[in-house]
Amino acid sequence: MSGVWGAGGPRCQAALAVLASLCRARPPPLGLDVETCQSFELQPPEQSPSAADSGTSVSLLAVVVIVCGVALVAVFFFLFWKLCWMPWRNKEASSPSSANPASEILQSPSSRGNMADKLKDPSALGFLEAAVKISHTSPDIPAEVQMSVKEHIMRHTKLQRQTTEPASSTRHTSFKRHLPRQMHVSSVDYGNELPPAAAEQPTSIGRIKPELYKQKSVDGDEAKSEAAKSCGKINFSLRYDYESETLIVRILKAFDLPAKDFCGSSDPYVKIYLLPDRKCKLQTRVHRKTLNPTFDENFHFPVPYEELADRKLHLSVFDFDRFSRHDMIGEVILDNLFEASDLSRETSIWKDIQYATSESVDLGEIMFSLCYLPTAGRLTLTVIKCRNLKAMDITGYSDPYVKVSLLCDGRRLKKKKTTIKKNTLNPVYNEAIIFDIPPENMDQVSLLISVMDYDRVGHNEIIGVCRVGISAEGLGRDHWNEMLAYPRKPIAHWHCLAEVKKSFKEGTPRL
C-alpha cells in the first residue's frame, strides 16, 4: 500500500478513505489483519519511509552543489583581487620601498609634484638612472614619472652631444642624416663629478662613427680604382720631317708596368698604329723579364702634313707569351698630334697607360644635327657626313648608309635610313630624317644611330652605333639636352661610333 500513496485520481483517494474507515472500526471487519491496519493508520502518505529517504537525498545533493559553487566563486574573486586590483598591488609594493631611495622618490606624491626641481639636483641623478632601468622591467612606476625622467635624460643627452662631439665634415653629413638617434643613460651629464678627460670625450658607448668607416671605404674604393686603371707610363717623342713628309715616332721607354708572369715580371713590347689606317702596323722588340723596359726605337709613317689633324696615334703595350696568346697590358691613344708642339722639332711626351683587355678599334665618326619644334612636335635629325669609317670590304672600302631608330622604353617604334654611298670611308649625306614626337614624350624617347655597310649578297653589317637621348651617356645626353635648351635651332656635333656588344636586348642594342 505504501508504494501507491499519492498515485491515481479521486477514485483512489476515495478507496483509501474507505479502507482507513474500515481499519478504524472496532472490531475490524473479517479479512483485515490488525497489525496491517495499525501500520496503515500510523504511516500516512507523507511519512512513508521511501518518500522521506528520496527527499533527504535530493536536499543533501542540492546543499553540496551550492556549497561547491560558492567556494569556486570565492576562489575566483580572491585570485582576481590578488592579481588585478591595482590599489592592493600599490599597497604591497609600497611596503619595501623604504629600502630603495629611488622608489621613494618616484612613489611619493610630493616628489611627483616637484619632479622638475629634483631633476635639477645632480645628487638625484644616480637614483634616476636606477629608476630608468627599473622602468624597463616593472610596471609599478607611474607613466607620467617615466615620461618626465626620459625627457630629462634626452635633454641632457642632446646638450652633452652638442658640447662633447667633434664637428664632422660636410662630407659625411648626408650619411649621418640617415642614422637613427639613440639615447644612452651613460651619456647623462653628471656635473662636476666627471674628470676633465672624460668630459672631453663622447661618453655614449656603442655609437657608430660613420666618418671612420666611410673614410676607409672611400679611400679603399679610390685605391682599388686607381690600381685597376694604372698600368704604368710610357715615354715617346714625335717629330715631322717636312722634306720626306714623314711622321717620326720614337718609343723611348716604359715605366712601372704590371707583372703578367708568375715570376713577377713581364716581357713587354709595343705596337704602333697611325689611325684610321690599321694596315700599317709597326712593333718594337720584346724585352725580357723587366717592368721598366728601354726601347729607344724610331718608326716612320709617311703622311702628308695636311692630314695630320685627322690622324690619331695608337700605342698598344703587350706582354709576350711563347706558348699562348699575348696578354694586353694597356693602351695609349693620342687624339691630337699637335698637343705638345707643332712637330717641327722632337718633343718628348709622357702618357699614362690605360687599362684595356683588347685592342680598341677606331670605327670612325659621324656628324649630325638635331632640331626640335615644340609647337609642331617635330624632331629633325640631319645626317651630315661620316669620316674615317672602318673598311668592311676586301677592297679596303665600305658601302655605308645610316639607319636611325626611334626608341621608347626599350622598344623600337620607327626606323628610317639614308641613301647608300658606294666605295667610300668618308661619305657625305646631308639628308634629313623627321620624327613626330609630342613635347610630353620627349623624356621617354631616344634615337639610335647605326652606320651600316651595305652588302649585295649577304647580310648588311653594322660598322658602329651611337645614341642620343635622356637615357644616353656622355655626348649623346649633352647633345640632346642642348637641343631641348635651344628649340628651333639646329645643333650639330661629331659623335664617335662604338661597337655593339650584343645585337639586341629587349629591342635595344647595347653599346
Swiss-Prot record:
Residues bound to Ca(2+) 2: 261, 319, 321, 327
Entry membrane topology: Single-pass membrane protein
Region (Disordered), start-end ranges: 93-118, 157-182
Binding site residues for Ca(2+) 4: 393, 399, 453, 455
Binding annotation for Ca(2+) 1: 261, 267, 319-321
Keywords annotated in UniProt: Calcium, Cell membrane, Cytoplasm, Cytoplasmic vesicle, Disulfide bond, Membrane, Metal-binding, Phosphoprotein, Repeat, Synapse, Transmembrane, Transmembrane helix
Region of interest called Necessary for cell membrane association (isoform 2), as start-end residue ranges on this chain: 483-511
Residue numbers of Phosphoserine PTMs: 217
Gene3D superfamilies assigned: C2 domain (2.60.40.150)
Residue numbers binding Ca(2+) 3: 321, 324, 327
BP GO terms, sorted: acrosomal vesicle exocytosis; acrosome reaction; chemical synaptic transmission; postsynaptic dense core vesicle exocytosis; regulation of calcium ion-dependent exocytosis; vesicle-mediated transport
Cytoplasmic side, ranges: 81-511
Subcellular location: Cytoplasmic vesicle, Secretory vesicle, Synaptic vesicle membrane
Domain C2: 230-351, 362-495
Cofactor(s) it depends on: Ca(2+)
InterPro entries associated with the record: C2_dom, C2_domain_sf, Synaptotagmin
Transmembrane segments: 60-80
UniProt feature, compositional bias: Polar residues: 160-172
Family note: Belongs to the synaptotagmin family.
Subunit structure: Isoform 1: Homodimer; disulfide-linked via the cysteine motif. Isoform 1: Can also form heterodimers with SYT3, SYT7, SYT9 and SYT10. Isoform 1: Interacts with STX1A, STX1B and STX2; the interaction is Ca(2+)-dependent. Isoform 2: Is not able to form homodimer and heterodimers.
Biological role: May be involved in Ca(2+)-dependent exocytosis of secretory vesicles through Ca(2+) and phospholipid binding to the C2 domain or may serve as Ca(2+) sensors in the process of vesicular trafficking and exocytosis. May mediate Ca(2+)-regulation of exocytosis in acrosomal reaction in sperm.
Domain free text: The cysteine motif mediates homo- or heterodimer formation via formation of disulfide bonds.
Record protein name field: Synaptotagmin-6
Species of provenance: Rattus norvegicus
Gene, per the UniProt record: Syt6
